């Protein structure tokens, strides 16, 4: 079985650390980033199966990440998380082809299930 590559982008270190630890226990290869700029540079070097990104970050936001991912790798699934969930944010994300959308605080069990569904869609 090949190992799936997951990228997590969130400006809260605790979210990145928690996601990395939990997802690595499931056997995923996980890379985390505290802002989008180095994450997008890494995406140009390496393909990821799923990208989990915060919606609201300084500099490049989650919607810009979503557009960049879909431009580079149209079949890579993007999961968005945010502490600022509202209907407009959700609609914008869904129009941008986000796979799933979660409010913070992030529930790791839900994230794991969403990642598994995203990977199943890719098969």
Tell where the protein language model's regions lie, with residue ranges:
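Acidic catalytic/metal-coordinating carboxylates
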Residues: 34-38, 61-64
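C-terminal output helix
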Residues: 88, 106-115
């Amino acid at each position: 079985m090949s190992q799936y590559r997951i990228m997590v982008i969130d400006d809260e270190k605790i979210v990145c650390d928690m996601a990395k630890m939990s997802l690595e226990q499931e056997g995923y290869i996980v890379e985390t980033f505290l802002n989008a700029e180095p994450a997008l540079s890494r995406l140009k070097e390496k393909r990821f199966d799923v990208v989990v990104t915060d919606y609201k970050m300084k500099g490049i936001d989650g919607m810009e990440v979503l557009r960049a991912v879909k431009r580079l790798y149209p079949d890579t699934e993007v999961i968005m998380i945010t502490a600022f969930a509202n209907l407009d944010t959700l609609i914008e994300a869904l129009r941008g082809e986000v796979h799933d959308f979660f409010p913070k605080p992030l529930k790791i069990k839900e994230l794991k299930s969403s990642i598994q569904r995203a990977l199943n869609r890719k098969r």
